[in-house]
Amino acid sequence: MNDAECLSHLLQVCARKTEEFVRTLDSKHMVWLLEIEEEARKMFSSDFNAEPELMPKTPSQKRRRKKRTSILPDENRDPSGRRISRRQSNASWSSSVRRLSVRNQNKANDDSIQEEPAQLKRMTRARAQASIKSTPVLETALPESPSQICQKNAQVKISEQERRSAEQKLIESDFELKTVPEITKDNVSETVNSAVPAVPVTPENKSRAAGKLKIAASSTPEQKAEMVDLTCESPRPANEQQLNLSNQSATPTGSKSDRRSVRRSLVVRKSSSRRASLASQFSLASKRESMTREAVRKSIRQSISQKKAAMEISSTSSQRSYQSSIEMVDDEITIKIRPETVPSETVSEEAPAAESPRRSLRSRAFKKIAISNLPDSEEPPRKVTRQMVAGNAEPTPETTEDAQNIRRKSYKRAVDELSDDERPSEEERSPPRKKTPSPPCPPSKIVRPPPHMKSFLHTVQKNQLLMMTPGSIGKNIIMKSFIKRNTPLKTDPKTEEKERQRLDALRKKEEAELQRKQKIEEGKKRKQEELKVRREERLRKVLQARERVEQLEEEKKKKIEQKFAQIDEKSEKVREDRMAEEKAKKKMTAKKQEEVECRRKQEEEARRLKVKQMEEEERRHQELLQKKREEEELERQKKIAEAKRLAEQERERQLLAEKERLRAEREKERIEKEKALQLQRELERAAQEKEQQRREAEERKKREQQERLEQERLRKEQEAKRLQEEEQRKAKEQAAVAASAPVMNVTVDMQNSPACESYEMTPKSCKVPSVKVNEDNYGMDLNSDDSTDDESQPRKPIPAWASGNLLTQAIRQQYYKPIDVDRMYGTIDSPKLEELFNKSKPRYFKRTSSAVWHSPPLSSNRHHLAVGYGLKY
């Protein structure tokens, strides 16, 4: 039983831990993951169809003094806010038209502005509670027609795609107005004001402040942009106040009074319920909204400064500026309608009933929310002009078509007449012109846009170039011209070359300026992010300190209430109530105990059944395990028998292999022995053959020597016979001469007489060649360049040990068994330098050479150095 309880407790703990983990995932991690996914989707799905932001300020624009205009400008003051130029008559008509439109707008807004109190008061807790109790729900009647809304509100600038979607929304709302009956006054009083956006109620839309509308700056460069919050006047819920507080973390940009009112409003707004968590206050959504606000502020300030500078330059062309100012005024008066600002009847029919309807006008500057881009509609855009709104009538097709023509005409003219800086890029992108020039056009007919339009279009095109990606170049960068150029083509090649060089230089300057601006912008962004992080940290610390103060106040309040409760408990009535409560509690506890006991019995019965089931399952499990063990044992025995059989086979195979190896070794040894015996026999036979050859050679030499001696002896004998015969013949001749000559006075030469030389006194000895005693002494001559030194035909026979198998055996034996040289010849001692150089004269330790080295005696340059140059003797 104890094990079953432990098991159930363990299951409960696991279930609780799992629920906590899932709750943590849903409340913390999934929020961050969803926001990261949203940011990634925005990054990868941006199509660059939205209106580009204006270019950032240059350093020269930053150094200019900012002109602060009041939130409620004086109606007698010129709203342009620029200096009176020397030629003010050119733009007087356009400025007067703008002044009249601004005065009408201010008169229409006077009533709504007076509803806002002049200054926010510091509210105590009691005053806040009293105001919550006493403030009634105000009923605000809707305006009679959408023209009143358009008159009260400032101009709303939207993009072209939002204009198309608004047109489609207007068509749908007109169709619904025809089908749906009129709404009663009671329902009208409960609906939201016309400024509330008609969007479906989603968690994302609930999290934002309801009914904020972005009122951007008008086209006149002197007006300052405002954000008007058209919400209801009843007190806000706590979550909306907290969201507004997180949105106001950015630095206010209004006047000092506005900043003071912001601080007081931060002090006044204390949450009546629990505060939002820090994750919701410092989430990516609030950071994204604050970054959007900063970007819009920057773009509005830059557009105002650029338009101011452009209006000062615009006084040069009087007629062109007159015509363009008419067109620009018409464009400025045009009201661009979003789906959020459709007529009040459509809003009241489609929007759900608001929590507490209220309507207030907040004049703090640049307070807004980012509105996402709406998808393009296939319907053509339609505009409602201010003249149509003043007539309290729906826009007729004729007026709409006129407004479209005016707008299209000025747009085409502005696109066609770009500034000179942008013209080369347009010529490169446009298709090649015709070879035949167009007919000449007088300069008076050439219409150019006003300078402020030039600078605006130039800025927009630069922004488009900055925001381009490689995939969007083919779609967005090519701007096609819809108007045929009327200026004649110049065919002067020198002028064209100069123009091309000037345009190349200008393009290079623009690229360098663009890179510099990008670097400056990156530095600005990095500094702004650092400032934003510091500001958020500071705000978080302030909020934490405020929460701590509130906690201390709540603890004090709880202590006071506890004291009052202790005092009240002393009374009799409290005691009676307590006794009654105790009786009721006892009844409830008894009832609960009975229920617990019944539940315990049921649980005990269920536990008992569960234990029985578990025991049955355990028994079946044990039986299965026993069967499995038996099967495993059989399988193991089979495996062991198989392993033994395989081992026996392996052992037999190894024995056979060993026997085969031994037999192969014995066979190999036998073959080697036979080879050695055969080699020895061959060596002996070769030695015998050599010895026999040597003996035959010696015998042959002896025979040749004997034959040579015999021939020499025979030759000498023949020579001796020939000499003897010669002498005998001479002697006979002399005897004959002597016999014939007289005997007296005859001198006889005794020296040449044959009697004296009858035999050889000392015969010449012949040198017999000595026989070699040492066969290894071949008597190799020192000069080996004689004609008999031929390796193919040596003069002397090669010994047996220097060729054949004996040489191979000797080399093999010397390789495997090298000769111990130290044992044969003894160890060689290292030489002692003292014994070699034992002279002690001091001059041997000096360098006494008188040589002068002009260059180092290297081996590379030693052979070509002259003696007189290298050494002195």
Swiss-Prot record:
Annotated consequence of substituting residue 837 to A: Disrupts interaction with aurkb-a
Region spans: IN box: 782-856
Residues where Phosphoserine is found: 849-850
Any GO BP: chromosome segregation
UniProt feature, compositional bias: Basic residues: 60-69, 261-270
Biased composition (Polar residues): 239-254
Family statement: Belongs to the INCENP family.
InterPro entries: INCENP_N (IPR022006), Inner_centromere_prot_ARK-bd (IPR005635)
Low complexity composition bias: residue spans: 87-105, 314-325
Record's keyword terms, sorted: Cell cycle, Cell division, Centromere, Chromosome, Chromosome partition, Cytoplasm, Cytoskeleton, Kinetochore, Microtubule, Mitosis, Nucleus, Phosphoprotein
Recorded name of the encoding gene: incenp-a
Skewed-composition ranges (Basic and acidic residues): 286-297, 491-535, 566-584, 591-649, 683-733
Subunit (UniProt): Component of the CPC composed of survivin/birc5, incenp, cdca8/borealin and/or cdca9/dasra-A, and aurkb/aurora-B. Interacts (via C-terminus) with aurkb (via N-terminus and kinase domain). Interacts (via N-terminus) with birc5.1, birc5.2, cdca8 and cdca9. Interacts with mtus1.
Location of region: Disordered: 50-124, 237-270, 282-452, 484-535, 566-649, 683-736, 781-800
Compartments (UniProt record): Nucleus; Chromosome; Chromosome, Centromere; Cytoplasm, Cytoskeleton, Spindle
Segments for region (SAH): 494-707
Signal peptide: none
UniProt remark on domains: The IN box mediates interaction with aurkb/aurora-B.
Protein name from the UniProt record: Inner centromere protein A
GO cellular component: chromosome; chromosome passenger complex; chromosome, centromeric region; cytoplasm; kinetochore; meiotic spindle midzone; microtubule; midbody
Pro residues bias spans: 437-452
Lineage: Eukaryota, Metazoa, Chordata, Craniata, Vertebrata
Pfam families listed in its UniProt record: INCENP_ARK-bind, INCENP_N
PANTHER family named in the record: INNER CENTROMERE PROTEIN
Known function: Component of the chromosomal passenger complex (CPC), a complex that acts as a key regulator of mitosis. The CPC complex has essential functions at the centromere in ensuring correct chromosome alignment and segregation and is required for chromatin-induced microtubule stabilization and spindle assembly. Acts as a scaffold regulating CPC localization and activity.
A GO MF label: protein kinase binding
